[in-house]
Amino acid sequence: MKVLITGAAGFIGSHACEHFIDSGYQVAGLDNFDDFYSRSIKENNLKTVKESDRFVFHEGDIRDESLLKKIFDNNSFDLVIHLAAKAGVRPSIYNVKEYYDVNVNGTLNILEAMRVHNVKKLIFASSS
């Protein structure tokens, strides 16, 4: 079984990667290292999973349709766990367009890639 986990370098995403690797899945992680909190923290979150031969990491943005096409074209995912999003209620008030672009349009890109590649299972967690 193969799973794509977006937001893989975040706290929840990195733990999801660990769980699915430990459960025998092949895991592809995707994250853009958004600066909501330190990149070094996120890199540390991925330290353990990057040691696994069942893990492949892609650095990039869910708004990048060509990147998503490449990732989906090169894999046959059974499941997508979509955790990537701009988080934080207060900052969203001052940057509505970017939050909308990432959280709505980025999610639509994931859904479209899933549709095109016939991936039927999605676990989606909303940002705060």
Regions found by a protein language model. Name each.
Residues 1-128:
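N-terminal Rossmann-like NAD(P)+-binding domain of SDR-like oxidoreductases, especially those catalyzing
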